[in-house]
Each structure stands twice: as C-alpha cells, then as structure tokens.
Amino acid sequence: MTINKINIGGVKYAVYLKKNLIEPDSHQHVWGYTDYEKSAIYIENKLSEQHIKQTLIHELVHAMLWETGAVDSYNDEKIVNPLGNMLYAVLHLNNLKI
C-alpha cells in the first residue's frame, strides 16, 4: 500500500509507515495514531497489509471526526472502532481499493 497524503475535509494529511510506533502521549506501542496538529497519520509498518489498511481506515475516522469538529467523539474508541470496522468492510466487500 502506498498512500503518502490523503485529503480529509480539505486538510492534507501525510501518511507515514513507521517501525516500532510509539504514541507520544501514552508512550505505548500502538498500531497507529493521528497527530492533528501536524496533520499526520502514523501506522506501524510491521503489520500485515490487511492490518495496515484497517489501521489507516481507523485513523481516517479519527481525523474525519476531528475535521468535522466532533470534539466529543473524535477520540472515543466506542465510536471510532465500529465506524472504522464498517467502513473497511464496505470498501473490502465491494472491491473498492484502499
């Protein structure tokens, strides 16, 4: 998968694959995180291709909620997880490229 930039609501987010990804605030190893101030999405590059795509979709949901001003929900995993899972399934089951 090669996506270097993605436009989310008019904001261009850079997408980076990184080894041994550590989330800056929690200092924990994560599969992905979004830096809203830098408009950047980081994804662990040791994941399988499928998990990289799923993680990208998950982080896109975070960024989409952020960019729409959904301050109460952009970081709520109870909202982001099901939306991300469903969006990935729709794309995958309909053979839409990610």
Predicted regions, residues:
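Active-site scaffold of zinc-dependent metalloenzymes
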Residues: 2-51, 66-67, 71-85, 89
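Short, Lys/Arg-rich amphipathic alpha-helical interaction segments
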Residues: 94-98
